[in-house]
Design a protein with these regions (language model features):
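Glycine-rich, aromatic-bearing surface loops/beta-hairpins
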Residues: 62-122
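Long, hydrophobic N-terminal alpha-helical segment
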Residues: 1-28
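Gly/Ser/Thr-rich active-site loops/lids in small-molecule metabolic enzymes
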Residues: 24-39
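Structural motif
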Residues: 6-9, 23-25, 47-55, 82-85, ...
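Glycine-rich loops and low-complexity Gly/Arg-rich segments
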Residues: 32-36, 49-52, 80, 108-110
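Ordered, amphipathic secondary-structure segments that act as subunit-interaction surfaces
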Residues: 45-71
Length: 122
């Protein structure tokens, strides 16, 4: 049902998925990297935008989250080089409310939330 330019959120265990999601998918026993890889096997990223991937910025709250490196590797392996956008936390929540769906995971890494913009299936 998702169309071109619809977005899907993959949230970590701290993400308020139930209160934000229009459509909620629960994958509590899985981490975000595993789910990200599975989603990208089935859903292409949008090639008509500069940054089809968005992350919740940690605003200097500690070091750059190590999980982001995994995301870059997974995206590159599935889609090639893509730009990532960093979003302020509340702006991320606002955008997530408009997403087609939210996948809630059991991910324990902090600032591990990610938004993917769907491309054209060929």
């Amino acid at each position: 049902e998702m169309g071109h330019s619809d977005e899907i959120v993959i949230g970590d265990g701290n993400f308020p998925a139930a209160s934000i999601a229009q459509r909620l998918v629960r994958l509590d026993g899985h981490g975000v990297p595993e789910v990200l890889d599975a989603v990208l096997k089935l859903m292409p990223l949008d090639t008509y935008v500069d940054a089809p991937v968005a992350l919740m910025d940690n605003n200097g709250d500690g070091d750059r989250p190590a999980v982001w490196d995994k995301y870059e590797e997974i995206v590159k392996a599935n889609e090639g080089d893509k730009n990532f956008e960093l979003m302020e936390r509340f702006a991320f929540y606002d955008r997530a409310r408009k997403a087609y769906a939210v996948i809630a995971t059991g991910e324990t890494a902090v600032y591990a939330n990610i938004i993917l913009k769907k491309g054209v299936v060929k």
